């Protein structure tokens, strides 16, 4: 074999690249100038290769004319730091009881460590990311979330206060709009401020959904640790509408940790977002695969 010999893999690669770019072109045209809200979480936040591929995806979106907005979680990172400092926390109905001291740690981790790491990742790939919390510019006004528990039907429900855990009361999109329609990529930590002046930790999926609604986003993309919504047989359900989702909830197909994500997606599309996607964040370049290929990846939820 001489130095000028080209193997089969080398012959295929340029053709494959051309085919992929050709398939992507209609989507680039379609979504140019549109806002895409991406919730970054799960394994994608702790695996170095996945973090790098995510950052490249976000930068490429901006380069081809999309307006990406990133909202991130950070529960595992919060748990690790609390454990390191010897701070014990309890969970009620899957939510962390958050006193003032714990909230200080939450703000430190979400608004500092995690947020700035994501900003740095995007900037290292040529983007211009700006880190924010919901407190910046009064972006997210929160109200305290109270849970209820009822032991017997005839008894009034017990109201449970879990501290500095909130839900979204109002979104002011002006800061995000200013950044997103310029050269910048907003990266948002899900911390809001209440009328009482206190900070509240809010579920990142819910924040992403509400921001997508207010920005009238084209798409909401939720990165998860599953391929998407699965049938009882474990098969991926690639497309759903609200009626189908309701039926799957009723028969128990959609349950557990997928429930809040699917409800977030439904609320977003009901609020005007064109489409919501629940995609596998464990797959490299999952965002690009969903945006730029005919097959897509994960589960698509639309109004119709």
Curated annotation (Swiss-Prot):
SUPFAM superfamilies recorded: Carbamate kinase-like
Gene3D superfamilies for this protein: Acetylglutamate kinase-like
EC number(s) stated in the UniProt entry for this protein: 2.7.2.8
Recorded GO MF terms: acetylglutamate kinase activity; ATP binding
Substrates-to-products reaction catalysed: N-acetyl-L-glutamate + ATP = N-acetyl-L-glutamyl 5-phosphate + ADP
InterPro entries to which the protein is assigned, alphabetical: AceGlu_kinase-like_sf (IPR036393), AcgluKinase_fam (IPR004662), ArgB (IPR037528), Asp/Glu/Uridylate_kinase (IPR001048), Glu/AcGlu_kinase (IPR001057), NAGK-C (IPR041727)
Site (Transition state stabilizer): 39, 261
Alphabetical keyword list: Amino-acid biosynthesis, Arginine biosynthesis, ATP-binding, Cytoplasm, Kinase, Nucleotide-binding, Transferase
Residue positions binding substrate: 74-75, 96, 201
Subcellular location per the Swiss-Prot or TrEMBL entry: Cytoplasm
Alphabetized NCBIfam families for the sequence: argB (TIGR00761)
Family: Belongs to the acetylglutamate kinase family. ArgB subfamily.
Protein name according to UniProt: Acetylglutamate kinase
